[in-house]
Amino acid sequence: MYKLFGKWDLTEVEVADAGIKRYVNLDPVIVPHTSGKHARQQFNKSDITIVERLVNNVMRNAQNTGKKQIALRIVDEAFDIVNSKTKKNPVQVLVEAVSNAGPREEVVRLKYGGISVPKAVDTAPQRRVDHALRNISIGSNQTAFKSKRSAAECLASELIAASNRDAKCFSINRKDGKERVAKAAR
């Protein structure tokens, strides 16, 4: 059986949120690197493991653009830190963080006679996963910028805080803000 980075077993990870279960891929791989095979089809990003999608989002930062080996190392070190702090499988912590950090409602603008009116709509499950991963990586990048803490430490603390639904966490804060605006627009 393959273990992620030679350490973490993906078969013991369970997705509790039924809405995103189809979009969180937990196929066993050693190194999460598919070389962009999903890029030709619109919704094929769901076929990539959730860890590689996190790696790709970490790689989006300005100084890390295109440096997948650096992003893989950051995620690997962050998973080690998560395991040492929580004594849980870090992929399980990642899945819990994604399910907690994905917004369930957002706002669209509708035009009625030249006037734009905000309307609350449910968020698609794949979009929930995308926003959660993006906000987790943005939060860790902002925390690590001009800080003595490493990017791996910041990513680990963001994952742990998001899995615990900590309101101080960037991704949970961003999710709550979106849902608050949507609630006002009902």
UniProtKB/Swiss-Prot annotation:
Single GO MF descriptor: rRNA binding
Keyword list, A-Z: Ribonucleoprotein, Ribosomal protein, RNA-binding, rRNA-binding
Q: Which Pfam families match?
A: Ribosomal_S7
Q: Which domain of life is it from?
A: Archaea
Q: Name one GO biological process term.
A: translation
GO CC term, one of those recorded: small ribosomal subunit
Family as reported in the entry's similarity comment: Belongs to the universal ribosomal protein uS7 family.
Quaternary structure note: Part of the 30S ribosomal subunit.
Q: Describe the function of this protein.
A: One of the primary rRNA binding proteins, it binds directly to 16S rRNA where it nucleates assembly of the head domain of the 30S subunit. Is located at the subunit interface close to the decoding center.
Q: What is this protein called?
A: Small ribosomal subunit protein uS7
Task: Please report the organism this UniProt entry assigns to the protein.
Answer: Methanococcoides burtonii (strain DSM 6242 / NBRC 107633 / OCM 468 / ACE-M)
Q: What is the lineage of its organism?
A: Archaea, Methanobacteriati, Methanobacteriota, Stenosarchaea group, Methanomicrobia
Q: Which gene encodes it?
A: rps7
